[in-house]
């Protein structure tokens, strides 16, 4: 809820508190389900196996999600669970599988259109740590566009001009801070 609070207080958004209240979400925990990024670095013996909690809205949702990469586009429509979740990440897979990718993860460009909210456009420039965040931000605004600079090779500056977001959020894991993550493929 901290990002939503800041968007409301500093940027004029009107994100309803119901979208940030955890009581308005279902939670299902999968025990001993994956090895997190630190565990993958140090090994299962040192890092252990983590639980994963899937969080989904209890309230009504209605989305169109556009997934664009490699010159193609896939369109998903329906509620949060049908349009946004990639349920194959909840199936039995190796422990090293990134379970957070269930929140429609690691694509060059995603556009979430929330048909239940009338305003608020966010452009998020992110790495894999943004996966669940853009999904949950999308519950309270009309549009979230998420770009992964590791995969998106066009000019992000031109993309922002063309799509006119109300705010741009840059969300990276601290380990990723470096020159290439701030290049934005801007044309000089």
Model-derived segments and their meaning:
Residues 1-188:
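Extracellular glycan-modifying ectodomains
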């Amino acid at each position: 809820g901290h990002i939503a609070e800041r968007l409301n207080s500093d940027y004029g958004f009107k994100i309803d508190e119901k979208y940030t209240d955890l009581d308005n979400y279902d939670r299902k925990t999968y025990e001993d389900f994956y090895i997190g990024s630190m565990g993958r670095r140090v090994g299962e013996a040192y890092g252990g196996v983590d639980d994963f909690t899937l969080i989904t809205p209890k309230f009504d949702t209605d989305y169109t999600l556009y997934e664009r990469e490699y010159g193609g586009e896939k369109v998903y429509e329906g509620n949060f669970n049908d349009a946004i979740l990639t349920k194959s990440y909840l199936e039995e897979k190796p422990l090293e599988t990134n379970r957070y990718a269930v929140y429609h993860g690691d694509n060059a460009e995603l556009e979430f259109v929330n048909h239940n909210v009338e305003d608020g456009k966010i452009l998020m420039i992110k790495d894999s740590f943004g996966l669940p965040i853009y999904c949950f931000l999308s519950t309270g605004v009309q549009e979230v566009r998420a770009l992964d600079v590791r995969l998106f090779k066009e000019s992000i500056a031109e993309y922002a001009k063309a799509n006119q977001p109300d705010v741009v959020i840059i969300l990276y894991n601290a380990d990723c801070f470096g020159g290439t993550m701030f290049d934005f493929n801007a044309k000089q």
